Structures are given as structure tokens and as C-alpha cells.
A protein has these predicted regions:
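Short, surface-exposed ligand-recognition loops at beta-strand->loop->(often short) alpha-helix junctions
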Residues: 11-15
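Conserved ATPase active-site switch/coordination loops adjacent to the nucleotide-binding site
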Residues: 115
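Vicinal oxygen chelate
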Residues: 1-10, 20-112, 121-130
Length: 130
């Protein structure tokens, strides 16, 4: 039987070592591996990857600039998760507020990490009624 594909994100960062340290300290990420310039991390069992910017690759010339990707985190304590990130240097985004969804209230807010990546942080409610 063929295994289904798995999706993850790779975040382009200006300094991979600094980014690894920040994601571990601020978000509680654990390091899966580190090749120097490219690293694998995970939060809550969800893997993601960091890649140091390569100025010779035009697709990677704008770390910290405009992005059309947002990383989503689901936790029991969205307020605490965001506060920890902001205390470590992230920029506060939208405050955690309740949104009425088909399953009830979903609390969500966000921040921008020091490398320009947008994060939304919500409670686990989308997964409780499946």
C-alpha cells in the first residue's frame, strides 16, 4: 500500500541558527535535525523546516517581506502561546478573540515572528467536533 503524501512548510529565514534558537525558545519547538543552513523542527508533532536564504535564488530574495502564507497553531492556551512569542521578540498581531463558527466559538489571534512569518494561534475547537 502506498503511503499518502504529507504536507509541511519550509520557512525561508536570513539566519538559520538564529531562527532555530528562536523557534525553540519562543514557541517550544523541538529540533529534529540541523544541517547548518537547513533544519527540521516540530511543534506538537507537526514538522516544519527552516532554510537559510540563498541570494542566488530569486524565489528567496525577500525574507521578512510580504508573504501570502500563514502558519496555523492550535493550542489549549492561545493567549499564553502568543504572549510567549511576543516576549521573545515577535510582533503582536490581532488579539485573541472569539469567532462564531458552525461548531461554536473559536478563539484565535496572531503574531509576526522576527523573520517576517505570520502566525495564527487558535484553540483546539476545530478538532473537537469531528
Amino acid at each position: 500500500m502506498t503511503e499518502p503524501p504529507v504536507i509541511s512548510v519550509m520557512l525561508i529565514v536570513p539566519d538559520a541558527d538564529a531562527a532555530v534558537s528562536w523557534y525553540k525558545a519562543a514557541l517550544g519547538a523541538s529540533e529534529l535535525w540541523n544541517l547548518g543552513g537547513v533544519a527540521g523542527l516540530q511543534i506538537g508533532g507537526a514538522p516544519f523546516f527552516l532554510h537559510e536564504v540563498n541570494p542566488d535564488n530569486p524565489a528567496e530574495t525577500s525574507p521578512g517581506g510580504v508573504t501570502n502564507v500563514r502558519i496555523e497553531v492550535f493550542t489549549d492556551d492561545p493567549d499564553g502561546f502568543i504572549a510567549r512569542a511576543v516576549a521573545a521578540g515577535a510582533v503582536q498581531g490581532s488579539a485573541v478573540v472569539g469567532h462564531q463558527m458552525p461548531w461554536g466559538t473559536h478563539r484565535q489571534g496572531g503574531f509576526t515572528d522576527p523573520f517576517g512569518h505570520k502566525w495564527s494561534v487558535g484553540d483546539r475547537s476545530p478538532f473537537l467536533n469531528q
